[in-house]
Amino acid sequence: MTDQQSRPASPRRRSTQSIADRLALDALYEIAKTFAAAPDPVAEVPQIFNVLSSFLDLRHGVLALLAEPGEGAGVNPYVIAATAFQRSPEAPAADVLPDAVARIVFRSGVPFVSFDLVAEFGAEAVPKRLRDAGQTLIAVPLRDPERSHFVLGVLAAYRSHDHNRSGFSDADVRVLTMVASLLEQALRFRRRIARDRERALEDTRRMLQTVTEQRGPAAPVSLDGIVGSSPAIAEVVAQIKRVASTRMPVLLRGESGTGKELFARAVHAQSPRAKGPFIRVNCAALSETLLESELFGHEKGAFTGATALKKGRFELADGGTLFLDEIGEISPAFQSKLLRVLQEGEFERVGGAKTIKVDTRIVAATNRDLEDAVARGQFRADLYFRICVVPIVLPPLRNRKSDIKPLAQLFLDRFNKQNATNVKFAADAFDQICRCQFPGNVRELENCVNRAAALSDGAIVLAEELACRQGACLSAELFRLQDGTSPIGGLAVGRVITPTVRVSAPPPEPAPAPEPAPEAPPREEVPLRTKTAQLSREELLRALESAGWVQAKAARLLGMTPRQIAYALQKFEIELRKI
């Protein structure tokens, strides 16, 4: 062994090596942090090159990937990132990375170092900007995260001899190889997240499809689910078709029971977001605190009981439609928070500081008079103008009489399918239903059909079996009575129910009786009784005769409830006569 070989490194050399090692560790630490926080690791490569330049004097970084990844693909790389080079995005990779170098790394799968590109490959094989005699190059392979034996790309960096350091050392090769390894791990992690997300979305789509198939027509999601051909409903459908393709917020207005969610789903189904999620929130069903957590989500530990992170409805509806039902019921304090999301498309989870951006279309619905609420200071004017970009007024059922029969048939078919029955409506039953006003709109019509089908004695429902023919239709009485002198089911009604939304609809007319009752003969005034015990058999019979043997009418004459009349009939063993 010579003296030169046995001679230990000088303190100055050891100090220089220690500084270089520390700089390399600092660079790797910064790069690892950048990749860990990056949603797209490839997009952070220019920043990585800046770190390498600052800490290790590695200039002119290049990341090139295969244009056609695969085992049999040729070497035809395209540049993803290149720093310190003035080049257009369409320029070939050979402008910043010699083809010969790319072929060597892609085919061998090992790092490549050149201390003089021109001397090694010839001037014609090296881009003009890289022909300086002092230009050196290091290139390491970037492997496919799923197939480690397959080279996906090349990570390269240049250094000029005219800098303080010349050429490359083994340490430089190791550092750049570790950077490539960090990039591979980040790509593998992001691919795994993307696969898991796609799998979760596919599971969600599959479950939604299963639920939709099980519900059948109960949850229509397109214009095909809207039943009716009346001019009023045709105008609404035309408006939905016109506005669905835009990004504008839609405000559905109308009385309770007019089917706002059905029309909101129709807007979603006709829009470019049809394949995205449709998320519904009933704003009236939640308190202000719960509504904030439900819409925005919350971080783990944000409040007592928040044992895990929960995404809000805005996040779940990203790329789709969020249906805010009963938006007129939210508190003034929460309106300002909602306004910010609608204006800027961003929010923070409850208990969190990270701002989340979403792309969600808003469809809101209300049966309140929002203009009056704004005038009274109960609803923010700026929020009103934000949600009321495209208002669509849904007509009440009494304004679309021709749609009642097909709707009733739809509900009857649904009842038969759900209960394995074959109940049908007689023609006079359909006629009777079509004469009703239905202040509860489509929801009340559905209840009416289901009640009649469930209580029917036979396979055909007759007109006299309907509640309105028996004087037991509460909603019909609510519309007929003008004062509160007559109790209905024990409740005094003070006024006629009117729509809460201002629409150009004529006042409802009382449903005419199918058969005019014979004029009652003069009789003595029946004294009011409030207790069944005070009622005599004769008084009850006299009231029934005057009322044409209709229990509800007899109850009103006696100032009693139908239940009390039924109890009195049982007590006195009186059978109702059919007239």
Swiss-Prot record:
A divalent metal cation binds at residues 468, 473. Residues 226-454 form the Sigma-54 factor interaction domain. InterPro entries: AAA+_ATPase (IPR003593), GAF (IPR003018), GAF-like_dom_sf (IPR029016), Homeodomain-like_sf (IPR009057), HTH_Fis (IPR002197), Nif-specific_regulatory_prot (IPR010113), P-loop_NTPase (IPR027417), Sigma_54_int (IPR002078). Residues 464-536 are annotated as: Inter-domain linker. CDD domains: AAA. Keywords: Activator, ATP-binding, DNA-binding, Metal-binding, Nitrogen fixation, Nucleotide-binding, Repeat, Transcription, Transcription regulation, Two-component regulatory system. Residues 537-579 are annotated as: C-terminal DNA-binding domain. ATP binds at residues 254-261, 317-326. Residues 505-518 are annotated as: 7 X 2 AA tandem repeats of X-P. Sequence repeats lie at residues 505-506, 507-508, 509-510, 511-512, 513-514, 515-516, 517-518. GO terms for molecular function: ATP binding; ATP hydrolysis activity; DNA-binding transcription factor activity; metal ion binding; sequence-specific DNA binding. One of its GO terms (biological process) is nitrogen fixation. Residues 505-520 have a biased composition (Pro residues). The keyword Repeat applies. Disulfide bonds: none annotated. Residues 502-529 are annotated as: Disordered. Residues 551-570 bind DNA. The keyword Metal-binding applies. Residues 40-187 form the GAF domain. Required for activation of most nif operons, which are directly involved in nitrogen fixation. Interacts with sigma-54. This is Nif-specific regulatory protein. It comes from Rhodobacter capsulatus. The lineage of its organism: Bacteria, Pseudomonadati, Pseudomonadota, Alphaproteobacteria, Rhodobacterales. The gene is nifA1.
